């Protein structure tokens, strides 16, 4: 197995800044989101993009990855890295690879006293809809077994059925005690940490506990008011649009955001005025009548930023 080229996966250059990489991540995550993409390998591509983002978005991990990439053809590196086949990036795993490449001693030398096992950290992708209720998830991962020099000797596959609580947030860490690597000489096992990654949604943006959704309106709906159907995470609801609504105006839908133990956020519908196609002769005449009736209105009377 070769070290994955995360820059190629994201379609960026190693010299690109974080802003460029983030833009690429959001674009690809939306493109391969299983709820949107019809491509047969969408889910695999989505997970691959998420794995690349997990590394390249962290300054320290990115620096370690860049250094590993420079040494990817080192025979000793390849022997160590092959033992991690099929696993996502894990900083602790790569510590052992660094040790073997750069001649450093591993963490576990010939100590005979009881030592606690390593913690293991894996990322769990969660869709927004799944945050509404507690749900079961089957987690598969590998537990590394270290030799006396602190290098990974082999890995033992492990599967757990775990509960993902309602209201989890992006970056939240869930501890599963004792599910990490075994302790040494009677020491306690390490822990397994599940790091929650909220997958980008094709409709909703997350702002703390609140959600935002773009609400397209026809000009007459904004001008005259209307009742329109708006999606939420659970169902569609009817929202009353007040007369004279403006583009960019935020309409609050209370209690339809993300829920946590202490607080439930709101959903904000952000108005976007959508013009109809090029008008025919009859429609153009109606627009002209409106223009004549509102001849004193000057939208550029006061200038300002959008």
UniProtKB/Swiss-Prot annotation:
Question: Where is this chain's protein located in or outside the cell?
Answer: Cytoplasm, Nucleoid
Keyword line: Chaperone, Cytoplasm, DNA-binding
Q: Is Cytoplasm among this UniProt entry's keywords?
A: yes
The record's listing under InterPro entries reads: DNA-bd_curved-DNA (IPR023859), DnaJ_C (IPR002939), DnaJ_domain (IPR001623), DnaJ_domain_CS (IPR018253), HSP40/DnaJ_pept-bd (IPR008971), J_dom_sf (IPR036869)
Any GO molecular function = bent DNA binding
Question: What Gene Ontology cellular-component terms does the record carry?
Answer: cytoplasm; nucleoid
Q: Which residues form the signal peptide?
A: none
**GO BP:** chaperone cofactor-dependent protein refolding; protein refolding
Report domain J positions: 5-69
Q: What is its main location?
A: cytoplasm
The record, for Pfam families, names: DnaJ, DnaJ_C
| PANTHER family on file | DNAJ HOMOLOG 1, MITOCHONDRIAL-RELATED
- Sum up the protein's function in the record's words: DNA-binding protein that preferentially recognizes a curved DNA sequence. It is probably a functional analog of DnaJ; displays overlapping activities with DnaJ, but functions under different conditions, probably acting as a molecular chaperone in an adaptive response to environmental stresses other than heat shock. Lacks autonomous chaperone activity; binds native substrates and targets them for recognition by DnaK. Its activity is inhibited by the binding of CbpM.
The protein depicted here goes by the name: Curved DNA-binding protein
Q: Which organism is it from?
A: Salmonella typhimurium (strain LT2 / SGSC1412 / ATCC 700720)
The organism's taxonomy opens as: Bacteria, Pseudomonadati, Pseudomonadota, Gammaproteobacteria, Enterobacterales
């Amino acid at each position: 197995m070769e070290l994955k080229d995360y820059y190629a996966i994201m379609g960026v250059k190693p010299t690109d800044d974080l802003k460029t990489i983030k833009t690429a991540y959001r674009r690809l995550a939306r493109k391969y989101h299983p709820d949107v993409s019809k491509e047969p390998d969408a889910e695999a591509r989505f997970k691959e993009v998420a794995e690349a983002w997990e590394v390249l978005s962290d300054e320290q991990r990115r620096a370690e990855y860049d250094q590993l990439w420079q040494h990817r053809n080192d025979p000793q590196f390849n022997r160590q890295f092959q033992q991690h086949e099929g696993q996502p990036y894990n900083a602790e795993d790569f510590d052992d690879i660094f040790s073997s490449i750069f001649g450093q001693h591993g963490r576990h030398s010939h100590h005979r006293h009881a030592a606690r096992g390593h913690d293991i950290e894996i990322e769990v992708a969660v869709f927004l809809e799944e945050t509404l209720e507690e749900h079961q998830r089957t987690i598969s991962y590998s537990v590394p077994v270290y030799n006396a020099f602190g290098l990974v000797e082999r890995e033992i596959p492990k599967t757990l059925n775990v509960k993902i609580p309602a209201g989890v947030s992006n970056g939240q860490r869930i501890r599963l005690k004792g599910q990490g690597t075994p302790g040494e000489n009677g020491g306690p096992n390490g822990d397994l940490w599940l790091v929650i990654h909220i997958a980008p949604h094709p409709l909703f943006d997350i702002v703390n506990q609140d959600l935002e959704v773009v609400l397209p309106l026809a000009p007459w709906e904004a001008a005259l008011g209307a009742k329109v159907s708006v999606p939420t995470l659970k169902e569609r609801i009817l929202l009353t649009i007040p007369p004279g609504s403006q583009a960019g105006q935020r309409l609050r839908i209370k209690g339809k955001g993300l829920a946590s133990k202490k607080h439930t956020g709101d959903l904000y519908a952000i108005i976007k005025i959508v013009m109809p196609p090029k008008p025919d002769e009859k429609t153009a005449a109606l627009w002209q009548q409106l223009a004549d009736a509102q001849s004193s209105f000057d939208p550029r009377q006061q200038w300002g930023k959008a």
